[in-house]
UniProtKB/Swiss-Prot annotation:
Protein family (similarity comment): Belongs to the Mediator complex subunit 5 family.
Domain of life: Eukaryota
Designated gene of the protein: NUT1
Entry keyword set: Activator, Nucleus, Transcription, Transcription regulation
InterPro entries for this protein: Mediator_Med5_fun
Pfam family, one: Med5
Name of the protein described by the UniProt record: Mediator of RNA polymerase II transcription subunit 5
Quaternary structure, from the entry: Component of the Mediator complex.
Length: 1013
């Protein structure tokens, strides 16, 4: 038997018997001594066996290749070259007419999943400094990457539909992952010493021309995949003049020193040890909850996994500690009860379900009781006293029940046994454990009894750990009702939600606003008036209730059209938000609009009520777009003496009926603007406003809707009226209106600061607002120097940083952060301060949240517009400063070093994990009693507890955990993986071993080497 035949038999047996990596390494050493073989031949044999099996994804194959690389038996460049030779990336799309021909051909094996894994292993090897060890190897890897890029670009061109410009790269998640992995590998290689030497040398011009041609083909496609990666490769192209043609020698000689010096400076910056400060997650969670809850399971898991690698025990402990710290800080700062509730709900309702989903997807077994015990031991005992301590304490005990609530929720989600609660508390709990809910059961209950939905919505305002299941059930029912156009039931659910703003906060802990509102907006936009042949008033009632919930979300969180799920410029909801509060000129109205306007004026002010004919001839959409014009014409007539005020008031009182009340949102908005803009006597408009804001009588059903309308409009009316009062200080008719509006002013949750807070920050000495941010930074560093001590957290509100960004801009705020980080570096706190600065930059921001989400939930630009960010973020500002590092390094090398370290760490934490293929884990999931959707992705809702986690987020959790460790090292900066190799290897091996188990790895005892041939 020849050497290659023996290796073929050996490798075939290894794959068939599911030999793990460690055993493969030992066995292959024996065979290498018996049958030495060339690396190319060995790889050919291994990859040919893979083709023969026809298996789409075998996790052992990349493991074997990685073992051979680490043993020094094959080089990375040879691996990449051989891998491409056998890759299905060369396959061309088959036309229908070629099916017969194809059936006669040997079916080729789909290899992209394996290709991605092997390339990511190469990426890890390069980023940790293991490869390349010589210039020749670096040249070989560059050449292989060039060939791979050209093959992927050719695949894209072959698979695109020229007639519709669809398909191509974006039609295949695996192709996108492969494409992105190649770019990151090229970036990592170009940042190594050997890589820089190759690119800087004049002796590799032919290679650089080919690389330039590959980059020129790669970069246009990269725009759709990863903008940071594109920017990095664009800098590489410009830095080394890689444009696919021989460079101008005189220009090249001028640029060489600059390029090499700049890159050598960055390569010379050494990273210190990574410290995860106590303040880091404390800042991050504060940022998630400071305004609109910015919670996305995929984003949060990505950040935490990048932060802690595979150390799930540390992750769980620190997240729990940070959330309790956030609650403690809120108590000391006297935050509102509404804010306290949101923090508490995040702790009790969100975290247990998030942990349960994370651990189920990762199949990691953790000593949760120990993790929770460690976290609780670090808490401030004055903020979270035990039941027995309450009686001996003089201060507030408002949070005394939080610890048992959290533990009961953990037990409900099967994270800990109920019997451990007493041990963790150190005493018998006074509460009884809540009953766990199951989403499917709740959906059935709602479908059977519509009143059950109202009960469940009210339970969202409790902290029993059931909110996830309730949110999942409520949103599923709402989506079904939208699809079925069952608007009567939908109306009651929308009314229940509109009158409970805190319930909306809880919903956003588990679902994005877009997930909730897109079906509602689509229903409102497509509402056909001729579909309902019954009475018009109930239809107005149902339409208004659904619209009011959309408006409640929009104004509470200052949502943009994208956040609402609006995709069409013809959307009724979009028109209402853009133009609804603006009156139209009569000349601009269509004939139909003029008729409708006349009919409504007649019904309100001349006839004895609103007739069925008036409503049936005017659809709800038409009415809402006419409301402000109706107000303008009526008020103008009254001011001109053509209409008595009592008649005006009496007519407008019809709008206080429940079926028309939501229209007051746009009407009051227009009225406030009209009063603020008018130069004439505002008496009549103010009296009108008074009658609508504080009506003399209103029905019980209408009272809750009216309160919601005031919640939505109060903030803008308050600002306008106070400005008018400053112009007319002697008027006595403004204060009564302000008094009515005052309780509604806290409705919005946008992360805006209070006036008193802003005054204290802007008057801070020295430095004003920026100085106060630096002072907060210093306090957080000091607090984090004793992370294990049970002490109160440093006073912090993320409103301060948000105010800085919104008022001064991210560039100035980042400069202040870098100034402080540089100072902390000089005083010996570099690593601790770096984590705090990085977290401030990585913390979610409402303005950029949709764009960040799109990295995890890709948007199809053919179906909906891409999200946009209206501000420069701190990360954008950091990227700009990083581009200036070459010049800065000559003037202020320490500051340049600080920026390089900051840039690396931010990218390491924020880089989304590459899209690894989803393993078929259905059998394991079923054994664990987890639900599996029809499409094979995990429904992260343990059947025993039944607490829902976002369906869209769940699809990504498993994939992200599979390759989390690789992502931590495979970021956009070549230096970010240094010093992390050992831990990362372990994590990857653990995950792949788990994957191997999924395909049925038996135990091997005393394996007979000879029996394998």
């Amino acid at each position: 038997m020849t050497s290659s035949e023996q290796w073929r038999a050996f490798l075939h047996q290894c794959l068939m018997r599911r030999i793990d990596a460690a055993e493969f390494k030992n066995l292959s050493k024996i065979l290498f001594r018996r049958c030495p073989t060339a690396e190319g031949t060995l790889l050919d044999v291994l990859l040919e066996i893979r083709l023969a099996t026809g298996i789409k994804w075998d996790p052992l194959l990349p493991l074997y290749i990685d073992c051979l690389c680490k043993m020094g038996k094959v080089q990375t460049s040879t691996v990449l070259t051989s891998l491409l030779k056998y890759s299905s990336i060369h396959d061309k799309p088959q036309s229908p007419s070629s099916e017969t021909v194809q059936s006669k051909m040997a079916l080729k094996c789909y290899t992209l999943m394996t290709d991605i894994r092997v390339i990511q292993d190469a990426m890890l090897s390069v980023s940790t400094g293991s490869t390349p060890k010589s210039l020749a190897e670096a040249v070989g890897i560059f050449s292989a990457i060039i060939d791979w890029i050209q093959a992927v670009v050719a695949w894209h061109n072959n698979h695109i539909d020229p007639s519709q410009q669809t398909g191509g790269l974006m039609s295949s998640p695996d192709a996108v992952s492969l494409f992105e992995s190649l770019g990151i590998l090229l970036t990592a290689l170009s940042g190594t010493g050997k890589g820089i030497e190759v690119l800087s040398s004049d002796s590799h011009e032919a290679l650089k021309v080919k690389l330039g041609q590959a980059l020129s083909a790669y970069l246009p496609l990269c725009m759709e995949v990863s903008l940071p990666l594109r920017n990095r490769l664009d800098s590489l192209q410009k830095g080394f003049n890689l444009y696919g043609e021989p460079p101008n020698k005189s220009l090249q000689s001028m640029m060489d020193n600059v390029n090499v010096n700049a890159l050598q400076f960055e390569a010379s910056v050494m990273d210190g040890p990574v410290i995860n400060s106590r303040a880091g997650l404390y800042i991050y969670i504060n940022a998630m909850l400071v305004g609109r809850p910015l919670v996305d399971d995929s984003m949060l898991l990505n950040y935490l996994t990048n932060r802690y690698g595979g150390h799930y025990d540390v992750l769980v402990e620190e997240v729990i500690t940070a959330t309790f710290d956030v609650l403690s800080n809120a108590l000391y700062r006297n935050e509102s009860s509404r804010t306290m509730f949101l923090f508490r709900s995040f702790l009790v309702n969100k975290l247990p379900s998030f942990f349960a989903a994370m651990l189920a997807a990762s199949m990691v077994s953790l000593p949760m009781e120990m993790c929770i015990s460690h976290a609780l031991s670090r808490l401030d005992p004055n903020t979270f006293p035990s039941f027995s301590q309450m009686f001996a304490m003089q201060g507030s005990t408002v949070l005394s029940e939080v610890r048992p609530e959290f533990l009961f929720a953990c037990a409900s989600h099967k994270l800990i046994p109920e019997s451990s609660i007493e041990r963790l508390l150190g005493e018998n709990p006074m509460q009884t454990p809540p009953v766990g809910y199951n989403k499917d059961d709740l959906v059935s209950q709602i479908n059977t009894n519509q009143e059950r939905a109202e009960q469940l919505v009210s339970e969202l305002e409790s902290t029993e750990g059931n909110a996830g299941a309730i949110v999942a059930a409520i949103t599923e029912v709402m989506h079904n009702l939208c699809n079925q156009k069952e608007t009567m039931t939908l109306k009651s659910i929308c009314n229940s939600l509109s009158r409970r703003p805190q319930a909306l906060d809880v919903i956003l802990l588990f679902r994005s606003a877009k997930q909730v509102l897109q079906p509602l907006c689509a229903l409102l936009d497509s509402w056909h008036w001729d579909e309902d042949q019954g009475e018009s008033q109930p239809v107005y009632d149902e339409f208004g209730s659904i619209l009011l919930l959309v408006l409640t979300f929009k104004y509470r969180y200052d949502l943009r059209p994208y956040d609402l799920g609006i995709t069409s410029n013809d959307s009724f909801v979009l028109k209402l938000l853009d133009c609804g509060s603006s009156s139209q000129n009569l000349d601009d109205l269509s004939e139909k609009q003029n008729r409708n306007l006349g009919a409504w004026i007649t019904a309100l002010f001349i006839a004895e009520g609103i007739s069925e004919e008036t409503m049936s001839s005017c659809s709800p959409q038409e009415f809402y777009l006419l409301v402000t014009t109706l107000f303008n014409q009526s008020l103008t007539a009254c001011e001109a003496g053509k209409l008595e005020f009592d008649t005006l008031k009496g007519g407008f009182e019809y709008l206080l009926e429940p079926f028309l009340l939501p229209s007051l949102v746009v009407a009051l908005t227009w009225l406030g603007n009209h009063i603020w803009e008018t130069e004439s006597d505002p008496t009549i408009p103010l009296k009108t406003l008074q009658s609508l804001v504080n009506p003399s009588s209103i029905s019980g059903d209408a009272r809750e809707i009216h309160k919601t309308v005031l919640n939505i409009t109060a903030r803008s009316l308050d600002e306008q009226l106070k400005d008018i009062r400053s112009r007319h200080p002697n008027r006595a008719d403004i204060k009564p209106i302000l008094d009515v509006l005052e309780p509604c002013l806290s409705f919005q949750r946008t992360g805006s600061c209070h006036r008193s807070e802003l005054d204290s920050w802007t008057t801070h000495s020295p430095g004003g607002l920026l100085g106060s941010i630096r002072s907060t930074f210093q306090g957080l560093v000091l607090w984090s120097t004793s992370p294990g001590v049970s002490m109160a957290p440093h006073s912090y509100t993320h409103r301060q940083l948000v105010a800085g960004i919104r008022m001064l801009g991210s560039a100035r705020v980042l400069t202040a952060i870098v100034d402080e980080l540089k100072m902390q570096t000089e005083t010996g706190n570099a690593d601790l301060a770096l984590d705090i600065a990085v977290t401030m930059i990585c913390a979610p921001l409402a303005e950029s949240f949709a764009i960040e989400q799109s990295n995890y939930h890709p948007v199809d630009p053919n179906k909906e517009p891409l999200p946009r960010c209206p501000v420069l973020t701190l990360r954008d500002a950091l990227n700009l400063q990083h581009e200036n590092v070459p010049k800065l390094s000559e003037k202020d090398p320490l500051r340049a070093e600080v920026i390089v370290r900051l840039y690396r760490r931010v990218n390491a934490l924020m880089t989304p994990t590459s899209q690894m293929p989803n393993l078929d884990m259905s059998n394991i999931i079923q054994d664990m009693q987890l639900g599996v959707e029809d499409h094979g992705q995990m429904d992260l809702e343990p059947a025993g507890a039944g607490h829902g986690v976002g369906d869209d987020d769940a699809a990504n959790l498993n994939r992200m955990l599979d390759n989390a460790a690789a992502a931590a090292a495979a970021g956009l900066d070549s230096g970010m993986g240094q010093g992390m190799g050992g831990g990362l290897d372990t994590s990857i091996d653990d995950v792949l071993n788990a994957a191997d188990m999924a395909v049925g790895n038996p135990e091997f005892l005393d394996l007979d080497m000879e029996g394998m041939f």
